[in-house]
Amino acid sequence: MAIVSAEKFVQAARDNGYAVGGFNTNNLEWTQAILRAAEAKKAPVLIQTSMGAAKYMGGYKVARNLIANLVESMGITVPVAIHLDHGHYEDALECIEVGYTSIMFDGSHLPVEENLKLAKEVVEKAHAKGISVEAEVGTIGGEEDGIIGKGELAPIEDAKAMVETGIDFLAAGIGNIHGPYPVNWEGLDLDHLQKLTEALPGFPIVLHGGSGIPDEQIQAAIKLGVAKVNVNTECQIAFANATRKFARDYEANEAEYDKKKLFDPRKFLADGVKAIQASVEERIDVFGSEGKA
């Protein structure tokens, strides 16, 4: 099935009580790891680029083409959406033009009426090309490539108004944050999530900041209507830990490792890339999307 819009498989997740993963990529190796995991688990997946990651990779067109070409060259058979994560209005429009198949417009830092107005414009332009759209109400705590949110509970009326713009899935603040969770974090507000899903029956909710939330809370949120869970920090930490360990081992066995030419970046980064894949596969298991392709 390969490259697709995310609308159908996210809605299928909502209708059938599981969630799909939205995994952020940063480069070629990251993308390969996510694709290998999705193919191994036969799970639909969104490969996401933040604005900063896309810039690092050479721009939206380069990032889009990298993902699409890897899907083809690796023989990937599961549904893959190429998704913009937390995009400003101008970035959303650019991604629509260069061939992303799913867009998140994040206007949660704007006044509500402006957020709704711009979201509707993005929906009109994206849907004209068969591209799915995610938008956000109630800022998610933490920082995501320059968008800083203090974290709040998404107002129910704002959520209903956003859905009326025609978006396909909704990111809503329910006590979640980006990045590592502090020790004094109080957990997801599942009562508020239930109120949201009761007000929006059958509509897919997106859980941002999925890294670090206890599995039982994620699964409880899925039962209440979360159909997409974003993961980034968790994979970054897994990659960093595995790469650091390899570097320490290299330092302790430098002559041996040099003889084996383990300074080759393809070998030097291999453990880190494997750690990303393992992390993605484990998240797919938790979300319940294995075998749902």
UniProtKB/Swiss-Prot annotation:
Entry function = Catalyzes the aldol condensation of dihydroxyacetone phosphate (DHAP or glycerone-phosphate) with glyceraldehyde 3-phosphate (G3P) to form fructose 1,6-bisphosphate (FBP) in gluconeogenesis and the reverse reaction in glycolysis.
Biological process terms from the Gene Ontology for this record are: fructose 1,6-bisphosphate metabolic process; glycolytic process
Please report the name of this protein according to its UniProt entry: Fructose-bisphosphate aldolase
Q: Which InterPro entries match?
A: Aldolase_TIM, Class_II_FBP_aldolase, FBA_II, Fruc_bis_ald_class-2
Q: Name one GO molecular function term.
A: zinc ion binding
The UniProt record gives the binding positions of Zn(2+) 1 as H86, H178, H208
User: Mind telling me how this protein is modified after translation?
Assistant: Phosphorylated.
So what family is this one in?
Belongs to the class II fructose-bisphosphate aldolase family.
Q: Which gene encodes it?
A: fba
